[in-house]
Amino acid sequence: MSTNQLDTKSQAWSALFSEPMSELVKRYTASVFFDKRLWQADIAGSLAHAEMLAAQQIIGAQDLADIQRGMAQITQEIESGAFEWKLELEDVHLNIEARLTQLVGDAGKRLHTGRSRNDQVATDVRLWLRGEIDATAVLLADMQRALVHVASNNVDVILPGFTHLQVAQPVSFAHHLLAYVEMFARDAERLADLRKRVNRLPLGSAALAGTSYPLDRERVARTLGFDGVCQNSLDAVSDRDFAIEFTGFATLVMIHVSRMAEEIVLWMSQNFGFINLSDRYCTGSSIMPQKRNPDVAELARGKSGRVVGHLMGLITLMKGQPLAYNKDNQEDKEPLFDTVDTVKDTLRIMAEMIGGEVAADGSRSGGLTVKAEAMERAALRGYATATDLADYLVKKGLPFRDAHEVVAHAVKDAIALGKDLSELPLETLQGYNATITADVHAALTLAGSLNARNTLGGTAPSQVRAQIERHQARLG
């Protein structure tokens, strides 16, 4: 029978009802075709629950053995693709329980003792999300390693730094990349912190008020690797703040990715020409033969809006719910699942596009190509060393505001002449202020500008190398 066909079997809860659920309602309320991805967490939670029930003598040893045997077969069936997911059984939980009962009889019916789907699904999602958090942490580290790798090879490459997208001051290209490393490092800290709140066990809270059975919740928590148990049964089954928190974290990651992707798109354009991307990360045009479009970066930028939307959806989902569980919470899974998939895929492909493919031995191939000469030409065109001239005058004794005004006049005249400040003759510069001497030209070079910013966190090459070493030691 097709997984989309309905049979006449009643739901696990249907004994009270005098008429069957309409097929439209079945389709509208079923979640199995998206929540079946929780099957491993569901089986793990059920096995831990069954072991605890047996240890507490709530079910017998033979019941436990039968449940374990049945779950092993169900695992094999799901992994092989032979398991039949049935829409009329609503969700992953009842599909697995129904198959278990079919395989082992009454032992399968005893599994749900002391448990509700309310605490079961909350446990499944937390258990699943914990694994995805750990996988995402690895990808975040890989993203940082890719950026550090490119930075380590481009410490002395000079990029025009921008404010308001206008040339501001020269910076090391490596320094620019390391700014994103810092952002992703904070994201990683947020992820590690939220994991502590995700890793709490709801199971044993039952529908909302706890249970009359002598459950050992701490035992189940230890078996499943949770740090502890949720302390209030109403809260445990009804809140999804952990899903909101993860999606909030993911939103920040995607915003950071989006900013970086925007710069990659700009840098690759002919008007900038600062970098090139491998053909494998670009697409062409169906009408314009010359086009090489940075679609990966553009999609990463676009997908940030998708994740922001999921965050807004989850917040809106929770804002009006009274305690305790409500069916609204079924709507938490699709945005959470898609957020996880989007963040993981985006981090993986962006790290590879920037830093190259990583071989088994740790070597890298590919990655973005840096056009150092184009970056330097752009910095020279934008009077990026104007602040350096002002600083030079301050060191000669002028108040900064006076120095600022002097340099503004010099820049205005240089623009009229079509020259950079460093190209103006000494005599011309001395006409703006008599304290200027021949050493001024050293201050007006791009390299001199970088070297002068030798403060902690600054763009001087010595500082940038120290930053790279710090990140390399941290990331391993």
Curated annotation (Swiss-Prot):
Q: Which domain of life is it from?
A: Bacteria
GO annotations under biological process? Answer: arginine biosynthetic process via ornithine; L-arginine biosynthetic process
**Reaction catalysis annotation:** 2-(N(omega)-L-arginino)succinate = fumarate + L-arginine
Q: Where in the cell is it found?
A: Cytoplasm
Organism this protein belongs to: Leptothrix cholodnii (strain ATCC 51168 / LMG 8142 / SP-6)
Question: What pathway or pathways are given for this protein in its record?
Answer: Amino-acid biosynthesis; L-arginine biosynthesis; L-arginine from L-ornithine and carbamoyl phosphate: step 3/3
NCBIfam families the record matches? argH (TIGR00838)
Protein name in UniProt: Argininosuccinate lyase
This enzyme's EC code(s): 4.3.2.1
What is the gene name? argH
Under the heading SUPFAM superfamilies, the entry gives: L-aspartase-like
Q: Which family does it belong to?
A: Belongs to the lyase 1 family. Argininosuccinate lyase subfamily.
A GO MF term: argininosuccinate lyase activity
One Gene Ontology term, aspect cellular component: cytosol
Q: What is its main location?
A: cytoplasm
Q: Which top EC class is named for this enzyme in its record? A: lyase
Kindly give the InterPro entries that the UniProt entry links to this protein: Arg_succ_lyase_C, Argininosuccinate_lyase, Fumarase/histidase_N, Fumarate_lyase_CS, Fumarate_lyase_fam, Fumarate_lyase_N, L-Aspartase-like
Is Cell division there in the keyword field? no
Q: Which UniProt keywords apply?
A: Amino-acid biosynthesis, Arginine biosynthesis, Cytoplasm, Lyase
